[in-house]
A protein has these predicted regions:
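Pocket-flanking alpha-helical
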Residues: 2-5, 22-33, 52-58
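Short, hinge-like loop/turn segments at secondary-structure boundaries
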Residues: 8, 32-35, 62-63
Length: 175
């Protein structure tokens, strides 16, 4: 919300790219929903097989030798400069709070894109979450997030009532 307000107040054009938006699938889902072909949507459930990298770990206790091909300081950027460890790089940085956002941050922008666009969702009015053990350094191994979005202005062929959107990762699945 802060970034949305900042972009509006400064006139800076912002855009979040999503490769899933370039295929016809998203347009078809929007067309079906906007034409009322599946009726009013009141619940959406989205899931991923991620993480496919380690999560739910404590921070490593020892440092590893930094590979000659890696500028660890440059990679770390403005994040906390932890001692280098092979558990962070390559690829696995996604699961560590200092560098990534876990499976939710890595995949939800792609998977939830269609429902957000097709259902014209804004900000949720209520969010509930549950997860496996949550540690301070690393995202949990699995989580479920439930978001409630208020009713939106009806479209010509379909109403947009309050909707419940669920996110599942790490093996947590709908009941």
């Amino acid at each position: 919300r802060l970034l949305t307000k900042l972009a509006a107040s400064t006139g800076v054009v912002t855009q979040m790219g999503n490769q899933g938006a370039s295929g016809e699938g998203t347009d078809l889902v929007c067309e079906w929903i906007w034409n009322g072909e599946i009726g009013e949507v009141t619940k959406v459930e989205c899931a991923t097989d991620r993480p496919i990298w380690p999560q739910g770990l404590n921070a490593p206790e020892k440092a590893d030798r930094i590979p000659n091909t890696l500028n660890w300081d440059l990679f770390t950027g403005p994040a906390k400069l932890n001692p280098y460890n092979n558990v962070y790089h390559p690829w696995n940085w996604r699961g560590w709070w200092d560098y990534g956002t876990g499976a939710l941050g890595d995949m939800a922008c792609h998977i939830l894109h269609q429902p957000f666009r097709a259902l014209k969702l804004g900000y949720p009015t209520k969010v509930e979450g549950s997860s496996t053990l949550l540690l301070s350094a690393c995202a949990p191994q699995a989580q479920h997030v439930k978001m409630i979005f208020p009713a939106r202005d009806n479209m010509p062929k379909v109403a947009l009532p309050e909707v419940e959107v669920h996110w599942y990762d790490g093996g947590m699945m709908p009941e």
